[in-house]
Every structure is written in structure tokens, then in C-alpha cells.
Amino acid sequence: MILYPSIVDLMEKVDSKYTLCSLVAKRARQLIAGDTKLVDIDSDKPVTIATEEVNNGLITYQRPQKYGIK
């Protein structure tokens, strides 16, 4: 269970808890694969690092354009 950053703080960065979960998971996988971490924290845990990156605004997301039937 994460205590810091709080879920309330993290929810200000995204539009839903599902987006948050997906964003952190994808970034954690990138870190496991060898990407360089963007924050300087003591933890070596990829999920903790990814969560801190999202909280600091270093990792963002973009929703794809919605296409409808015309």
C-alpha cells in the first residue's frame, strides 16, 4: 500500500483510477526493461519510481482521438 504520494494527489494528474493504474504499470514495465528513471529517489522498486514520476508530472498520457460513425 502506498502512503506517499497519496491517491488523492495522484488523481489530480489523471482522469480516472484506471488510467492511473495503466500509466504506472506501463512505465514500471519500461523501467524493468532498462529505461532510465526520471526521478532521484532511493527506491529501486519500479512501481514506486513510476508512481513518483507520475506525481511529479514527468509521465503523462494522451487519449486517442475518438472516431465515430459518420
Swiss-Prot record:
GO terms for cellular component: DNA-directed RNA polymerase complex. The keyword Nucleotidyltransferase applies. InterPro entries: DNA-dir_RNA_pol_omega, Pol_omega/Rpo6/RPB6, RPB6/omega-like_sf. Keywords: DNA-directed RNA polymerase, Nucleotidyltransferase, Transcription, Transferase. It catalyses: RNA(n) + a ribonucleoside 5'-triphosphate = RNA(n+1) + diphosphate. GO terms for biological process: DNA-templated transcription. PANTHER family: DNA-DIRECTED RNA POLYMERASE SUBUNIT OMEGA. Promotes RNA polymerase assembly. Latches the N- and C-terminal regions of the beta' subunit thereby facilitating its interaction with the beta and alpha subunits. Belongs to the RNA polymerase subunit omega family. NCBIfam families: rpoZ. This is DNA-directed RNA polymerase subunit omega.
